[in-house]
Amino acid sequence: MAENIDPSAPEGSAESAVQAAPVPIHTNPGQLSLLAWIESLGGGLAEGVELFNDEEKGHYIRASKDLPSGLSSGTVVARCPVAATMSYLNFYPTLEGLPKHSFKYNRQFLRGTEPDVASAFLLMDQYLKGDDSPWAPYIKSLPKAENLTTTQYYEDEDLEWLDGTGLESIRAARLKDWKEKFEEGKMLLKYAGNTAIESYTWELFLWAMTIFGTRAFTSRVLKEFAPKSTPDDKIFSVLVPLVDLSNHRPLTKVEWHITPDAVGLKVIDGVKPGEEIHNNYGPKNNEALMVGYGFCLPDSIVDYRMLTIRAPMESPLYDATKRQNRMFPHKAHRYESSDYYITNIFFPFGDESSTIEKTVFSQNLLDAMSVIGANERDVKVIELEEDRIYIPVTNFGRSRSFLSGLCCLQQQLSNHIANANKGDYLKKTPQNEKQRNAQIYRQTQSMLARNAVAVTIWLLERAKDANWEENKHKVLNRLLDQLPEDWYGLPVRDRMRSLLTERESCVKQRELYKNHEITMHLPEKTRECFNEFTGRIQTSLDEIVEELEVDLPCLELLVYSMFIRFCVDTYKYLGPEKSKTALGPRLTKWAPLILESYPDPSDHDLLPEDSDTDYLLTTIHEAIVEMRENDIDTFKPVEEYAGPWVDKHGWLSRRSLRWAWYVAEDELLRVSYPPYSLVAGYPPEAPSKPVRRRSQDESDHEDLYFYIPALNEAEG
């Protein structure tokens, strides 16, 4: 199979020869000069291949319309002599077969600059020499600064189109880095006695660096000419005239045709008459294309989006990374942005048998978000390997961290959607090519984020819905209804539908519960007893709740806290075997997990840190004590399960209730509500905060769900 041309991939080879073809009438004078120069050095275009120019694409190569059957597979369509290339090798005069030049430099300059920076200075120098440069025909054919569209050339109103995209900071960092390299290089050339340095302006250097960045190939294309790359074995970029006129198209099957004296481009698939001949830069995403090449593809199936994961100090991920560094000191562990990404739902390099999650999210992203979403119980089981930090989410009770990570990821992605919509640039009319590229970039970034948010909604709904198999198609239709029709045609919607409904998922059904849903796994008799008891408790507390202005989240936490106490005290009082009848198999397995993970208040007095919560729980406890004194019959049925009431150590004692509240907060997940609005591009305004600091305002757009892990199929 053919290998794509990619800086990180090996090149192919070919046996085909190139026959120089007559220049067609479409070639303009500038390109004719370039082509004539290449032909004079022994290169050129294959028969039936022509240079073409139009306003939209500029100069490119294509198969002639006059060809009866197009170009066959294996044709070497363009060939550039090594003598026409420009690269770091031109600083090594002992290498034969390269053009001679008069650029003034010394060894200190080469030692003090990176290969591509040195090459940019060479290109500047040759540009200033005009017709006296051996590369004059090529340099004349290169685009002028005003025609370059990389982000480095965005100014004034163009820059506004990058607002909130992340490209702003990338652009600023690159310009700062290049400016420093420019100043350092000029200083070294001054010491080398170069008298032309005053002519080496920042603007010209920016142009030269951009030319190398947008047109150059890897030094591997010269491996037959210089097998060791350079005398000091450096990797560098190479300008390959004529061949560099081929434009990028993802997944195009092409190979290098490399000989000791030339670099050629060979097509693997046939090319029809009049069809453009493309190159393949590798699976680059639109961010890389915008920054490195100055264009953007609206429908690239190989697109993906990098996410920045910042682990706050003392967070689980931060602490785990520190421990990993101590365990594996020989390897510097830094989480790079390339580790965290979301992919296009059509991404062709994934495993078709993979789960929904791993189709859209990178494994490192899933691992990191799970660790970030870890609670006190999850932190204890974080696994450290040389190249991985993760929580074994397949073990009983460990999927909570994964679900929590999905909630965090959903929040972050919804903010990305909002940023893409910022300034309403998706609806404005671009005034030039740079603005058109920026608009396409915003749209593709928004689509990637929307697709990923749709997946998180689907997975979290799966974890919440008791009748998932019955309701999942309703969820799917609601999701698809929120997607912009002008962006999401039938093929995209069909792909989303098949992805969500036909692939397996790591997320188990029904592990998240809201309010009284948590009792559904209690056997019917036990459930009726518990619900009747808690109903009377809540009725008695209505006046207190109204007086204290207790919000809905606190009432939900109270329900969860009483449920936790009931289950763990029933388990302790009745024992494992009898608990199976009283609690059911799922809660009988869950109760000891909670007791083991959170020390009982008889050993550690775990109190809520918030003074308002402390006051609320004290008031509630006092009301429960008073209620028991006045209506002891309400408590008797429950005591058959949870044991006799003992004021200091009973299942609703002051200390026990505080402990249960603490556990409830730690086991909760905060899920965005209404979730479907996130796909439409309307994220919550307030950022996510720890549960115990949740305000009344936040209840408008987040729901509290309690986590109870599912049993394996054999256990259930």
Segments the model singles out, each with a brief description of its role:
Residues 2-81, 88-93, 137-716:
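Long, positively charged leader/targeting segments at protein N-termini
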